[in-house]
């Protein structure tokens, strides 16, 4: 899969899970007899949110986005559906075009340690996926332990 395909797949999933979570919140407010729906939808959305953030960072590094663009992608995921206009802008500016950077190019940035490490992982997608899933699982577990975001500062 190309960076564009991965980003679009995860971005679409993030928007769909926002809709799922908001729907279950509305049902709960209307007296839903199955209140576990919010827990399930929230967990699914939380996992997809973390996946979106990880894919935005990985694709952003690969495509050499400025830090502000990567930070924008991640922070806009906090607001329901705010990633949709951002994603359209990425499409229009062709910021998602190109293949994975698995080999060094003539770009001087390819000589630094971070780009070499990044290319090493990108050239080993199963290892990268295993590392990302491990990190996201640890983060997801920590967030589950902390409880809903509305209770973090009580």
Please report, for each region that a protein language model flagged, where it lies by residue:
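Hydrophobic, aromatic-rich membrane-embedded alpha-helical segments
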Residues: 71-89
